[in-house]
Amino acid sequence: MTNPTSDGQPRGRLRVLVLGSTGSIGTQALQVIAANPDRFEVVGLAAGGANLDTLLRQRAETGVTNVAVADEHAARRAGDIPFCGPEAATRLVEETEADVVLNALVGALGLRPTLAALESGARLALANKESLIAGGPLVLAAAAPGQIVPVDSEHSALAQCLRGGTGDEVAKLVLTASGGPFRGWTAEELEHVTPEQAGAHPTWSMGPMNTLNSASLVNKGLELIETHLLFGIPYDRIEVVVHPQSIVHSMVTFVDGSTLAQASPPDMRLPISLALGWPHRVPGAAACCDFSTASSWEFEPLDNEVFPAVELARHAGQAGGCMTAIYNAANEEAAAAFLAGRVSFGAIVETIADVLHAADQWAPKFSETPANVDDVLDAQRWARQQAQRAVAQARPATVSAKTPGVV
C-alpha cells in the first residue's frame, strides 16, 4: 500500500484495478486516472465483453496486460485475454496486486469480486452497490474499518459531511433524489411510459440500467439500503427528499440542529476521484458551483404513493437477512422485462412488491443472516423465479397519446 508523506499527501502512485471499465463509471474513472498520472496507474481492466472494441482501446491506451472478459466468445475474438469466463473478474482481483479496486460492474454479479477485493486488503472504491445490497452481512464482515469507500455521489457526499461531527452527534442522514424524468406524473400516466422515455435522465449521464432504476426510484431504494450498510444509521433516521437540480448530493443533520450539505454540479468524476484517492482530494477533478450567477435550489417530499420503491427498500432492509438481495434480484428481472417491452413501467415496482410479499409469507428463512455466498445466491435464484412468474402475469406494456412527452 502507498504510505503518506509527512504532510499527509500520498507518496507514489496508487495502483488501480478497474472492474467494469467500459461502462459509464469505468470510462470516467480512466479519464480521472489519465489526468493524474502522478497519483494513479491502471494495473488491470475487467468488462463483460459487450463493448469489446472499447476494452481493447483501453488496454492499448493504458498498456496493461491483466485484462478480464466475462463473455468467453468475446474473449476468444479479442485474443490474448488472460482471464475469461463468469469468474474472470474475481480471478483478476485475486491475482493482481492493487492498492485500489474500483468495482463498477453492473448487478449482483459484482458480489464475488467485491469479496475478493476486500480479502486482498485493497481499498474498495464501490460503485457496484448491488454487491453490497445483495451480500450486506457478508461484505461488512469481510471489510476492515474504512476499507470500503463509496463512489455513488450521494454516499460520497455523506462521507464528506460526516467528517463534520462524531457518530453520536448525527441526528439523521438525508439522501437527495432528482425525482427522475417522471417527477410529478401520476400512477396512471406512468403505465404508458416507454423504455426510451425511461432512458432519459434529466441531470445525470449513466448506463441504461442505472438510468431506468433512477426513473423508477428503485435506484434511490438501493441507495437507502446502501446508506444504512455503509454508515450504520438506522433506517428510521434516513430520509429521502427530491431535489430536481441535483446540486446538493446529500446532507447530514446533527443533534444541535445544524445541517451540513455537499454541493457540486452533477459530475461523477468528483466522487470517483475522491474514492480513488481517499481521504485526499484530487485538484481540478470537476467544476465547482458558480455562485456569481442567480440560481435556485428546490427541495420537496418524495411521493411514496406514486413511487413506492423507496419504502419497499426500507421494508426489505428492516427485515434483514437476504431480503435486500431479493429486492434487487426482483428488480433486475422486472426491469429487463420492461426494457424488452413485455411489461408496463408500473409493473417493475409491482413485481418487487409481490416478490417481497411472497418472501414474507412463504420464505421466512430469507430474513435470517446468510452464512455464505451460496445462501445469497439461493435467495436471488428464488427471487428471480418468483419475479419471472409475476412478470408473466403482469399487464403488458401500452402507450397512450395522453402520456406527457409522448407524441
Swiss-Prot record:
EC numbers, comma separated: 1.1.1.267
**Family affiliation:** Belongs to the DXR family.
GO BP: any one term: isopentenyl diphosphate biosynthetic process, methylerythritol 4-phosphate pathway involved in terpenoid biosynthetic process
Q: In which pathway does it act?
A: Isoprenoid biosynthesis; isopentenyl diphosphate biosynthesis via DXP pathway; isopentenyl diphosphate from 1-deoxy-D-xylulose 5-phosphate: step 1/6
Q: Which residues bind 1-deoxy-D-xylulose 5-phosphate?
A: 129, 153-154, 178, 201, 214, 219-220, 223
Q: Which UniProt keywords apply?
A: Isoprene biosynthesis, Manganese, Metal-binding, NADP, Oxidoreductase
In terms of InterPro entries, this protein maps to: DXP_reductoisomerase, DXP_reductoisomerase_C, DXP_reductoisomerase_N, DXPR_C, DXPR_C_sf, NAD(P)-bd_dom_sf
Q: Pfam families under this entry?
A: DXP_redisom_C, DXP_reductoisom, DXPR_C
| Residue ranges the record marks as coiled coil | none
Among HAMAP family, the record links this protein to: DXP_reductoisom
Q: Does the keyword Metal-binding apply?
A: yes
Extract one GO molecular function annotation from the record.
1-deoxy-D-xylulose-5-phosphate reductoisomerase activity
* Protein name, as recorded: 1-deoxy-D-xylulose 5-phosphate reductoisomerase
Cofactor(s) named in the record: Mg(2+); Mn(2+)
Residues bound to Mn(2+) are 152, 154, 223
- Which positions are annotated as binding NADPH? 22-25, 48, 51, 128, 130, 207
Gene3D superfamilies in alphabetical order: 1.10.1740.10, NAD(P)-binding Rossmann-like Domain (3.40.50.720)
| Catalysed conversion reaction | 2-C-methyl-D-erythritol 4-phosphate + NADP(+) = 1-deoxy-D-xylulose 5-phosphate + NADPH + H(+)
Q: Superkingdom, according to UniProt?
A: Bacteria
Give the protein's function. Catalyzes the NADPH-dependent rearrangement and reduction of 1-deoxy-D-xylulose-5-phosphate (DXP) to 2-C-methyl-D-erythritol 4-phosphate (MEP).
Gene behind this protein: dxr
